[in-house]
């Protein structure tokens, strides 16, 4: 399911640890700039991260990438693994237009 950054950040504010912001870009992209409080889990290693127990199934996962394509793939995979609260919030291009510069 795709929602906007604003919807995701507003709707899913909950207890610490309940909502996580997941960046599925590669490390070099993340280092160039990322969302506040984002955690890096590249799409290329997402299967291993899930197998290693990186996420809890009751957590809200707000997933993004550069444009929304990789985050869409990541959400499809996460949902297929039982993470029903995985949401594609698009890409950093959308974020910068709406909220301004990224963190480094």
Enumerate the language-model features and the residues they cover.
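Rhodanese-like catalytic fold shared by cysteine-dependent sulfurtransferases
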Residues: 1-20, 27-60, 70-104
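Short, surface-exposed ligand- or partner-binding patches at beta-edge/loop junctions that are enriched
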Residues: 64
């Amino acid at each position: 399911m795709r929602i906007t950054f604003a919807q995701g950040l507003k709707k899913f504010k909950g207890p610490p640890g309940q909502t996580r912001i997941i960046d599925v870009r590669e490390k070099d992209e993340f280092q160039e700039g990322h969302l506040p409080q984002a955690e890096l889990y590249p799409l290329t290693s997402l299967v291993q991260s899930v197998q290693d127990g990186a996420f809890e199934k009751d957590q809200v996962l707000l997933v993004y990438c550069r444009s929304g394509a990789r985050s869409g793939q990541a959400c499809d995979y996460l949902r297929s693994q039982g993470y029903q609260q995985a949401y594609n919030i698009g890409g950093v291009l959308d974020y910068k237009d709406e909220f301004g510069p990224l963190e480094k």
